[in-house]
Amino acid sequence: LCDVTSNGRVDLGIARGAYMFEYERLMPGLDAMEAGLRMRELVPAVQQLLIGNYTHDGDYWKFPETTAVPRAIQKPVPIWIAARDPHTHDFAVANGCNVQVTPLSSGDGEVQVLMDKFNTACAAHPEIPRPKLMLLMHTYVAKTEEELVKGSAALQKFFLYFGKWFKAEAPIKDGFIEPITQAEIDAQPNLSVENMRKNCLVGTPDEVIARLKSYEEMGYNQFSIWLDSAMTYEQKRDNLKLFIDEVMPAFA
């Protein structure tokens, strides 16, 4: 229906999820490994449902002949798979899906590693037209170093909490996890403000353009700003305005 109402503009993104907190509430006993297996069964089934008159008899789902209606305008509807490990890259490419990757807070070295994994998957499936590859990164554009340091500090806070949620060890009350302590900050120098400034896409418009050009040269053909962070509304607004006004024209 969304594809019809948007006149064929829908892209469908599928991922296995990340947090044990979510797995435990979705299905007790579910872990990342099984979530990945379920995703691998789900994706081909969704592709066939969009074609229509599809019967499924899998390990996790079984249903009689079924069709998704109304029929989508796009044939096929573009599907994106979030991937980090080589097996997921290979699965996505083998099934004709586009791929989205993120280096998280690991920097440009990891950006290249992820591209290498994608290229390996494409080389293993020469019969499949090369899918698109999207890079997702936390991005903050500002004019002064003072603003950039403040933005980097907000990203540090985000990743500290991201890791705490991921470990699923801290108590959660009223939907919020316990606050980060100074000891936890000190124990993770890899998430220092300086490293956030270097590893995330943080910089002046010219600096951000230069790094985006380097990703384009690697072979990435789409970019997505990871906006979720510990920044204020005003920081996010000003960041987006600068990106739109001064970064995007370089790629028009």
Residue ranges and their predicted role:
Residues 38, 42, 240-252:
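Alpha-helix-loop-beta-strand connector modules within alpha/beta enzyme cores
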